[in-house]
Design a protein with these regions (language model features):
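A glycine-rich helix N-cap at a beta->alpha junction
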Residues: 12-24, 88-106, 301-314, 332
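A short, small-residue-rich loop immediately preceding and capping a beta-strand
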Residues: 39, 62-77, 94-97, 232-234, ...
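Hydrophobic, small-residue-rich alpha-helical packing segments that form membrane-like cores
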Residues: 43-69, 74-130, 135, 148-161
Length: 454
C-alpha cells in the first residue's frame, strides 16, 4: 500500500531505476515527501491516526475528506480495535478502507477472520458484521482490484457525513502468478530469478540463498517439539523469522501458535503457558517487541515466568526505514527485573543458549539472535552442560594491557581489532565474549580492570 502511494507521489524511480534502488525508505516518511503525513511502519495504527485527523479537521471547522486504509491482517492488532471503537463516536466524515486479501504475512488467525470470510461470501450482506456491531456504517466492494470500480465507490462515499467502512476484497500479489500462488513467501523478498521465482544470494546471483538463523531455529525448535510435548513455538504473524514453514507449522500442530499481529497477547499468553508448566518460545523482531513493553514488565517479568523470547533483527542494519530499526532492545530489556538477556556470537553458542533456555525454569530468558548472517565457530562452542543462569563472561584469548569486549554480532569485529593490535602494534589484547547483554560479571570486570590499562 505504501509503495503504490510512493509511486504516485513522485517516487516511482526507487522501484524502476536500478541506479536509484533503495533511495526511498520502505515506509511512509515525511522527510521524503509532503504527501507522507506520518513516519509509520508498524501496523494497525491507521484508524487511530484517521480519528485524530478527522477530529482536528472538525475543530478547525474544515470540510475535507479523511481516508484511512488498513489491511485485513492488521485487524488482528489490538490498536485497530481501539481505533474502530472510537471512530464510531465521530459524527463527521471518515472513510476507512479495509483492504481484505484474506492474508496477513502468513495466513490470518483469529475468530474475526471467520466473519470477514462470511462477508466476502455473501457480497457484504451477511447479517453478522463486525464493523456494524461497532457502530460503523458499511459498504462492500467485491472487485477490489478493479481500479475503476474502486474509484466509483469512493466517488459515491466522498461527501458522506459520518464514519463508514469500505470493505474491498482484493488478491494479494495480483498480476504476478508466483506471488498469487504463494503469498506468504512473496510478502517480503530479496533478489530472485524472475523465471523460476528462486531466491538468489546477493552479489552471487547464480548461487542459492545461504542458510540463516531462521533456518536453524526452525530445525532446533521442531526437534524440541517432537521430543517434548510441553514446548510451544509462538509467533505474532511472522513465522518465517523462526524458520517455521507451512510444513513445519502443520507438523507441530497445537505446539505452534500464530497469534496474529498481537505482540502484547503473545507475551502474556507465553507468561501463562510458562507458569502452567509449558515451555513457550516467542520469536519476534526487536522492533515489534517494543509494542509489548508493558506486558514484558507487568506480566512476564513481574511474574518471573520462565518463557523464552528470541529477539531477531536487533541492530541498525538491513533497513532503510527508522520504523524498523531495533537498537532499543538492550536498554528496554535491561531495565526489567528477573530477565536474562543473552547475546550469542555464533551459531553454536546460539543453539546452546536456546537448548538451555527450554529447560531453565527459574526466570524469563531473551536471546538476541545474531543478525549479520549465519556464523559457525566451533572454537567458540560452549560445553554441553553450560549453565547460563550464573553471569560468567568467556575469555576467548588471554592477553595483557588491553582488553577487547565484543558482544554478540560485534564479536568478529572485536576479534579483528585484537588481531590488528597484535599484527601492527605488538599488543596482545585479551579478547572477551561477554555473552550477557544486560548483566555484568562484576568480579571478572574488577579483575580485568586491575590487570589491564585499556
Amino acid at each position: 500500500q505504501t509503495y503504490a502511494h510512493k509511486a504516485l507521489t513522485g517516487r516511482a524511480y526507487t522501484y524502476i531505476d536500478p541506479e536509484r534502488y533503495g533511495e526511498a525508505s520502505g515506509f511512509a516518511n515525511p522527510d521524503e515527501s509532503e504527501h507522507d503525513l506520518f513516519a509509520m511502519g508498524h501496523t494497525s495504527t491507521s484508524v487511530s491516526l484517521g480519528c485524530g485527523l478527522a477530529h482536528a479537521r472538525d475543530l478547525a471547522g474544515d470540510a475535507y475528506n479523511v481516508i484511512t486504509i488498513i489491511g485485513d491482517g492488521s485487524l488482528s492488532g489490538g490498536l485497530a480495535f481501539e481505533g474502530f471503537n472510537n471512530a464510531a463516536e465521530l459524527d463527521s466524515n471518515l472513510i476507512i478502507i479495509v483492504n481484505d486479501n484474506d492474508q496477513s504475512i502468513a495466513e490470518n488467525h483469529g475468530g474475526l477472520y471467520r466473519n470477514l470470510a462470511e462477508l466476502r461470501a455473501s457480497n457484504g450482506t451477511c447479517e453478522r458484521n463486525v464493523f456494524r456491531a461497532m457502530g460503523l456504517d458499511y459498504r462492500y466492494l467485491d472487485a477490489g482490484n478493479d481500479v475503476l470500480a474502486l474509484v466509483d465507490a469512493l466517488q459515491e462515499l466522498r461527501d458522506i457525513d459520518h464514519p463508514i467502512v469500505l470493505h474491498v476484497s482484493t488478491a494479494k500479489g495480483k498480476g504476478f502468478e508466483p506471488a498469487q500462488s504463494d503469498p506468504e513467501r512473496w510478502h517480503h523478498v530479496g533478489p530472485f530469478d524472475m523465471a523460476t521465482g528462486r531466491k538468489l544470494c546477493p552479489g552471487h546471483p547464480s548461487e542459492p540463498a545461504p542458510r540463516t538463523y531462521a533456518d536453524i531455529t526452525g530445525e532446533a525448535l521442531s526437534a524440541a517439539i517432537e521430543r517434548d510435548p510441553q514446548v510451544v513455538g509462538i509467533t505474532a504473524a511472522t513465522p518465517y523469522i523462526m524458520g517455521f514453514t507451512p510444513e513445519l507449522r502443520a507438523a507441530a500442530g497445537k505446539q505452534f501458535v500464530d497469534v496474529g499481529i498481537a505482540e502484547e497477547h503473545a507475551v502474556t499468553f507465553a507468561t501463562a503457558l510458562a507458569r502452567s508448566g509449558a515451555k513457550p518460545v516467542f520469536g519476534v523482531y526487536g522492533t515489534f517487541l517494543q509494542r509489548a513493553y508493558d506486558e514484558l514488565w507487568h506480566d512476564l517479568c513481574l511474574n518471573d515466568a520462565p518463557a523464552t523470547i528470541l529477539v531477531f533483527g536487533a541492530s541498525i542494519f538491513g533497513t532503510t526505514s527508522e520504523t524498523h530499526l531495533s537498537f532499543f532492545d538492550i536498554s528496554m530489556l535491561g531495565g526489567l527485573p528477573n530477565m536474562h538477556y543473552l547475546a550469542p556470537a555464533c551459531m553454536e553458542e546460539y543453539l546452546s543458549m536456546l537448548s538451555w533456555s527450554l529447560d531453565h525454569r527459574e526466570h524469563p530468558v531473551a536471546i538476541r539472535v545474531p543478525g549479520i548472517g549465519l556464523v559457525s565457530r566451533p572454537d567458540l562452542a560452549p560445553a554441553e552442560d553450560t549453565d547460563y543462569s550464573a553471569v560468567r563472561y568467556n575469555v576467548v584469548r588471554q592477553g595483557r594491557d588491553v582488553a577487547v569486549l565484543a558482544l554478540g554480532d560485534f564479536f568478529e569485529l572485536g576479534e579483528r581489532v585484537a588481531n590488528r593490535l597484535a599484527a601492527e602494534y605488538g599488543i596482545e589484547a585479551t579478547l572477551v565474549n561477554p555473552r550477557y547483554a544486560t548483566e555484568l560479571d562484576r568480579e571478572f570486570l574488577d579483575s580485568l580492570a586491575a590487570e589491564h590499562r585499556v
